[in-house]
Every structure is written in C-alpha cells, then in structure tokens.
C-alpha cells in the first residue's frame, strides 16, 4: 500500500487510516454545533470517511455536498455514506466555494495541505456565509516513535519541512486557521486528536513510516535512517478545530 498514487491519495491508504482517524477525532466538538437540519459540505472528502463518522452524530434530515479534486474518490464517497442522507458531489477547489446556505463546513486532514492564502480564502468563505466549520486531524508537527532512535528528531524536522513545501503551512496550519477565525470575531474550540497506534495497527504503522521516511529523505537526501526498524508504537499528533460565528 502506498499513501499516494499517480493521481492523488490512494483509496487503499485512506481506508487503512480510517479506523485510526475515527478513534482520534474529538467527538465532543460535535455537541457544540447548532441544532437543526444539516447542509454539510465535506471538503477534500476522500473516500467519505468524515461523512461515515459524522452523519450519525448529526440530526436528520441531512444533505451532504462532497468536494474533492479526484473523481475516483468522489464516486467511492458518494456510494459509501449511510442510507437516508441526500448526497451530491462536486469536483472543485475547496478554497473557492460559495458556501451560502451551508450549515456546516467540514474537512479532515486538509488544512496542513493548504497555503496561507488558501486558508484565508476558506475562512473568509465560512465567515461570509456564517457557516460553522469543523476541521479535524490537522498534523501539528510531532510524531513519537517507540522504540525511539537518535535519528528521530532530524527525521521529524525533515518531514515537517517537506510539509511546508510550495508555501503550504503544514504543521502551522491549524494554529493559523484558528487565529484567522478569531481575527474575524469567531469563537474557536480546539482539541488534541492524536493517532495512538500499537501492535494492532501493524500495517498502518509500516505504511505510515515508509511515507514519513520517504518525505523526509526527499527533503533531506543525506538523512541517516535506521534500516529494518521494529516499531511497536507510534503517536502522531493532530489538532481538531471547531469555529463558530
């Protein structure tokens, strides 16, 4: 399994990480959302994992509008949401949407892939439409691997620098997004949402670590990384963010 393929994130990677994502998300933030019928826009929806996690936690009726750049993922996501929910798909730039009439904007593992200007556009769209926003699982730049190795700090730093390529905010994205909403006078709630991976996540740990090392080495080709590493546990730190008008 690879995390990406020629056209974007591989569906197999998204399926592999879904149980860890489900366990990590801060479900208590959902209780802070306004009550009532839901029109939800899921940005960068992937295979629809956010919809599968969130739809059962929101009141009915629900209308979901799924956005992704990858038509393969949109097709998978549209088929996978629970019955009784209205589902539409749109292949579009998630940072250039008219959100009028949207009762909730949501995304998972998206903010750290965006540049400063893209986040500012997204925040302004939410503010203009007065649409609450729930953004989950943004990486914050820290991963703890057990057993530890002397190379881990350099590995983590190189990975974070790779995340910042092309002007992306990477590990700073969640904090920047929170500050932007606050600047507009909104209330922001944040929660830690770490992956806690153990022996039962063997395949996910191996796949994540291969991608982690590959990105770090792309950033710093001379990076020394231990071979045949026997990892037993990994904690990957994320942050969930809820912004309310």
Model-predicted regions and their roles:
Residues 48-96:
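Class I SAM-dependent methyltransferase SAM/SAH-binding core
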Residues 37-46:
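Conserved class I S-adenosyl-L-methionine
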Residues 113-126:
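A short, conserved alpha-helix within the catalytic core of class I
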Residues 106:
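A conserved beta-strand element that flanks and buttresses the S-adenosyl-L-methionine
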Residues 2-34:
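Class I SAM-dependent methyltransferase Rossmann-like catalytic core
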Residues 131-192:
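Conserved catalytic/acceptor-binding region of the Class I
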Residues 182-245:
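Conserved Class I S-adenosyl-L-methionine
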Residues 109-110:
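Short catalytic micro-motifs in class I SAM-dependent methyltransferases
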């Amino acid at each position: 399994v690879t995390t990406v393929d020629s056209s974007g994130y591989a569906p197999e990677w998204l399926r592999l990480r879904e149980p860890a994502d489900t366990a990590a998300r801060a479900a208590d933030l959902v209780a802070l959302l306004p009550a009532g019928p839901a029109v939800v826009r899921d940005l960068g929806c992937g295979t629809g994992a956010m919809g599968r996690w969130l739809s059962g936690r929101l009141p009915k009726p629900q209308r979901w509008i799924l956005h992704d750049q990858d038509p393969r993922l949109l097709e998978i996501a549209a088929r996978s949401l629970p019955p009784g929910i209205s589902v539409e798909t749109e292949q579009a730039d998630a940072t250039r949407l008219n959100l009028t009439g949207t009762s909730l904007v949501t995304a998972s593992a998206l903010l750290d892939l965006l540049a400063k200007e893209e986040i500012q556009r997204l925040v302004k769209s939410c503010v203009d439409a007065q649409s609450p926003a729930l953004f989950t699982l943004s990486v914050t730049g820290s991963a703890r691997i057990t057993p530890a190795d002397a190379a881990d700090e350099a590995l983590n730093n190189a990975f974070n620098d790779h995340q910042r390529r092309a002007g992306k905010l990477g590990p700073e994205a969640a904090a920047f997004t929170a500050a932007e909403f606050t600047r507009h006078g909104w209330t922001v709630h944040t929660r830690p949402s770490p992956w806690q991976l153990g022996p039962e996540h063997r395949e996910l740990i191996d796949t994540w670590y291969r991608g982690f090392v590959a990105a770090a080495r792309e950033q710093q080709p001379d990076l020394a990384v231990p071979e045949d590493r026997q990892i037993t546990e990994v904690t990957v730190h994320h942050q969930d963010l809820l912004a309310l008008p």
